[in-house]
Amino acid sequence: MYQKILVPVDGSAPSTRGLLEAIKLARDDHAQLRLVHVVNTIVSAIDYAAGPGSTIDPSTRTNDADVAALKRAESLVTQNGLNSEPVLLSTVTDNVGELIVRQAKEWNADIIVMGTHGRGGLSRLILGSNAEHVLRHTQVPVLFVRGQPGN
């Protein structure tokens, strides 16, 4: 049924639950998996303190935790006997959800499988909702996998 499954990953428990569901789908359908981790490289106060002559390029800032999250996801796929294509994206200005939508369109994904924290109310308002953005702006079917209660 699905040939190309896009899976946003961030290293969180809900993200891992989404990945495990995507692995099941991929195994059943012999589908390709693309793992996408988006780094939002907001310029920190330290970067501003470096001054106007600074050579710091915030668009290239990733850290070991970002790379490790993607590698852990890739390892989980491999442990389940499948292959995946990891993609690390970086943004300063774009909404993380928008990059996921764009990636799904560019890759011609058949479905996006996404773990969600299931936050609502004030929490969602403060934290934003990548899941909601993806749902509202993609033309691709989306499967949300909720985290465990309390996560």
Model-identified regions with their sequence ranges:
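Small/aliphatic-rich secondary-structure junction motif
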Residues: 3-55, 76-85
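Short, flexible loop segments at boundaries between secondary-structure elements
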Residues: 142-151
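Structural beta-alpha unit
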Residues: 75-112, 150-151
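Short, hinge-like loop/turn segments at secondary-structure boundaries
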Residues: 50-54, 103-105, 130-131
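Glycine-rich, Arg-bearing micro-motifs that act as flexible, cationic patches
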Residues: 111-133, 151
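A short acidic, glycine-rich active-site loop
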Residues: 53-68
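Short, well-ordered secondary-structure micro-motifs
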Residues: 18, 45-48, 97-99, 124-126
